[in-house]
Amino acid sequence: MGNQHRIFVSSCASGAEGAIIAFDLDAETGRLEQVNRYDDIEGPFYLALAPDRAHLYSTHAPSGFEGGDGMVAAFAIDSESGALRKLNEQSAAGTTTCYVDVDPTGKALVFANYSSGSVGAFPIGADGSLGEMSSFVQH
């Protein structure tokens, strides 16, 4: 892509407004072009791109940010179109899941739950999917 960079933005909204949108950014001109939109997700919030740039992870709140457990979803990214394909999702066992990051090896994902005051981790499989929660700390 040379001076083109693929970026992903979450809308942090529910219903028809809830989406993760893929853009191509032209670094020379600063022009953004929407290339894809994934809207089968409620309340997408924080995003993390895996080091392989082939997988994206999103926190989201299917029950709204103040009710029910937050979730972390795993997606495969189509490198040509920017389309997302959901691999799986796991409960974050807390409310307002507000942070997510992938370790530099791409083998683990960490998250934080703001309202319920907890952090945890999931292993990441070879296919990019999330395994069962491997660590959880309640503060």
Give residue spans per PLM region.
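Short glycine/acidic-enriched loop and turn motifs that connect beta-strands
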Residues: 13-16, 61-66, 115-118
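Beta-rich catalytic cores
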Residues: 16, 42-45, 96
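Short loop/turn segments immediately following beta-strands, especially the blade-tip
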Residues: 22-30, 75-82, 121-132
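An edge-strand/N-cap motif at the start of beta-rich repeat modules
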Residues: 1-14, 22-23
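Asp-box/WD-like beta-propeller blade repeats and closely related beta-sheet repeat scaffolds
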Residues: 83-139
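Residue-level detector of Asp-centered blade-edge/turn motifs that repeat once per structural unit
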Residues: 2-3, 49-53, 102-106
